Amino acid sequence: INEGTRIRDKLRDGVENALRILGTAFIAHPGSSELRARIDSGALDSQQFYRQLLRLIYRFLFLMVAEERKLIVPEATAGGTSHTVYSRYYSVEQLRRRADKYFHGDDSTDLWQGLRQTFRLFRDDEVASSMGLSALNGELFGENACRDLEGAHCRNNELLRAIRELSVFRTDKGVPSRVNYAGLDVEDLGSVYEGLLEFHPVLRSSPPSFDLVTGSERKQTGSYYTPPDLVHELINSALVPVIEDRVSKAKDKEEKEKALLGLRVCDPASGSGHFMLAAARRIARELSIVREGESEPTPTVYREALRDVIRSCIYA
C-alpha cells in the first residue's frame, strides 16, 4: 500500500509539472496570438484555460492506460496494418519513446499537430473507421473540450518535457522509473484529481506564463473527491440491495439480465468517476455471473458485461 501511495504521489507531481509546462508553452508560443487575445479580452479566463489543460492531461492519461492495456486496436486486428500505423504515428507511446531521448532545442510544432490528428481519431466516426478503430463519442475528446488549445501552438521540446513528466518518476533512490499505466486504476487517477482540487490557476501576461498556486477552489466550488472506503459503503448500502431485489424477482436468466441492464445510476457531479466506475463494476460482476452461470466469471465475459453496463446503466 505504501509503495502504491508513493507512486500516486509521484504521478500527481508529474501531472502538476506537466500542467505548468504546457500552460506556459501554449500561451508563450509566437503562433498562439489568438489564444493570448482571448485571454487578454477576458473571453477565456484562468479557470476555463485550466479546465482545458486538465482535459488535455486526462486525454494523455486515458490513452496511456488504453495503449498499455492494448485496448485501442481490437484484438482481432492487433498486429495488422491499423495497429502498426497507429502505434508508429498516432500513439502517445511513440511520444513517450521520443521523450526518453534528448530533445532540447526542438522548436518545431509537428508533434502537437500530429496529436490533434490522434484526438480526431477518437471523436470522428469516419476518421476512426478508416483506421479500423471506433470513435468514443465522449466529451473528453469532443471538439469543445480543448478548443483553444487545439487552435494554439506548442513546441516539440516542451510537449516532450510534459510527456516525460507523465511517463517517468524517480524512485526514493533517485532512479528513473517508467510509470506502469497498465496497472493504474481509477483510484490512482482519482488521487491525482484530488490533489489538483487544491490549486488555483494563475495566468501572467509579461512574460506569458501559467502557474498553479494553492488556493480554496475545492471549498468554493464544492468539489470533493470521494475516498475508496466511502465509495465501498455507498455501493453496499445503496446499490447492492437494489441489485439483489431485481435479481430475486426475475424468473429466468433473460429476465435477470434485462433487470440488471435496466438499472440507472446517476451522479451529476461525478468528478473523477470513482463512484460511477465502482457501481458499474458491481453491476457488471452480477451480470457476468448471470450470463455465465458461474460464481467466478471469465475475464472476457466480465469485460463484455462491464461494457454493456457502462453503455446502458451509467449516467454522469
Language-model features, listed with the residues they occupy:
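Short mixed-charge
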Residues: 247-259, 287-309
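Preference for the N-terminal adenyl/adenosyl cofactor-binding alpha/beta module
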Residues: 1-284, 313
